[in-house]
UniProtKB/Swiss-Prot annotation:
It comes from Emericella nidulans (strain FGSC A4 / ATCC 38163 / CBS 112.46 / NRRL 194 / M139) (Aspergillus nidulans). Induction: By beta-alanine. GO terms for biological process: carbohydrate metabolic process; gamma-aminobutyric acid metabolic process. Belongs to the LamB/PxpA family. Gene3D superfamilies: Glycoside hydrolase/deacetylase (3.20.20.370). Involved in the utilization of lactams. Required for the conversion of exogenous 2-pyrrolidinone (gamma-butyrolactam) to endogenous gamma-amino-n-butyrate (GABA). This is Lactam utilization protein lamB. The gene is lamB. It comes from the Eukaryota. It holds the Pfam family LamB_YcsF. Coiled coil: none annotated.
Amino acid sequence: MAPIKKKALINCDMGEAYGNWTCGPDLELLPLIDIANIACGFHAGDPLIMMETVRNCKAHNILVGAHPGLPDIQGFGRREMKLSPEELTAITIYQVGALQGFLDREGVRLNHVKPHGVLYGMMCRDYEVAKAVMLGIPKGIPVFGLPGTNMEKAANDLGIEFRAEFYGDVKYDSNGMLVIDRKKKPWDPADVEKHVRQQLEDQSVTSVDGVVVPLPIKDYDVSICCHSDSPGCLEIIKTTKKVVDEFNKKYGF
């Protein structure tokens, strides 16, 4: 397939510490990214961490989005839960609203909403889950999601702007779905470079089964997601930035 048609950006999940427990070298990562998805207290984060993360993003001119997850701090939002559609809508409103308070205080605009972890995976697989979560997104705010899944369909059906994601540190299965591990596994920088370059240059990915899977993103804006809790995340994001910068320069973006 052909290269993507727009400038690629890098987004990263941030503010995923809790109390005295730290997660990820956020301050070291901020100069390397374009967009931050800030945890909103359900899978990680707390009021003080949210406030500090918003301030740090503002200082680095980073676009800020809400990163709502399932109410499961112990499992870091990576354990599936059964919630009603009403609950899914409500927890989204609650978490996005919490972040909005800190954004308003700092004069920072809410750029988007990007669901976290297993909730993201549930939305990819289940249209009703995707729809319920998206009903909790404020009017006029885009959603980040995986193209070709129920996230894209629900967003389009509800008139929500959809922005596509590729992944720098997550593998895909042969159906083009993400393989979400409870605990992140290390990546070799050479594998990260190959993984990201294939997605940008060919709109495809080599699955865990060795199958080349197309990932058509149409004309959506696109960013590469990396995670601050991945082992070696600093090298992963430096490698991703190298590939992204080379791609954008090559195609004049």
